[in-house]
Amino acid sequence: MNGETGRWIGGVALILAPLVWFAGLLLRHLVLKDFTPEQVAWFDEQPFAAPGQLAAYAANPGLVTAAYSVFLLGAILLLPAFLMLAKIVAEKAPALAGWGFLLLALGLFARVYFAGVDLAAFELVDKLGLEQATRLVMDDYVDLSYGLWRIPVTASVGQYAGGLLLAIGAFRAGTFGTGRALLFLWPCTLWMGVLKESEFLSVVTAVALGLALVPLGVRVLTGRRPVDQKSRALSW
């Protein structure tokens, strides 16, 4: 992320990534909108959200495909956004920035794996029908979610630890005050896994991420250094 090109890539990513992430979570939140309250209540009673998500795909494959695709695009765009944030933080807190970004990147890689399993499950609905596809997915849901040698599920933990480290680093470096550090940390606690439901609170976490990253992206693009928050106990 060095030089003029790196600054532009990083700045655009800081602005665009949380917006696309928000759009993906919002669309995923809407995939159950056409079901009756009784149907939604039945989905909620299941141990996992997968049956509801597969039923949503069977009912409206275009919407569900768009929702999951935009969500994946947001996850991919977050990689350069987090890299730019880590680069800024590294000037004053290099260890926290480096480890925070590395762990967050592992979490994003895990999301790509989960997206692949999501796609395979939707393909099963197309080929076998909803009932048989749901049975096959639920019979092996835990193994599908954990992945080979449990590498994906282990990597997904990086999101939580990495978000905490980078938030602390951003606060100590003065890049974020306590307000934006907490706003950044909150979406880093978002669910991980296969065929997960986006609840309203999930959408709100994306708004929090935008409030944390978009102003920083604007400053990066305009060539202004982030305001030093002086690591005060209460600051933006």
Which residue stretches match the model-derived regions?
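Hydrophobic, aromatic-enriched alpha-helical segments typical of multi-pass transmembrane helices
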Residues: 1-236
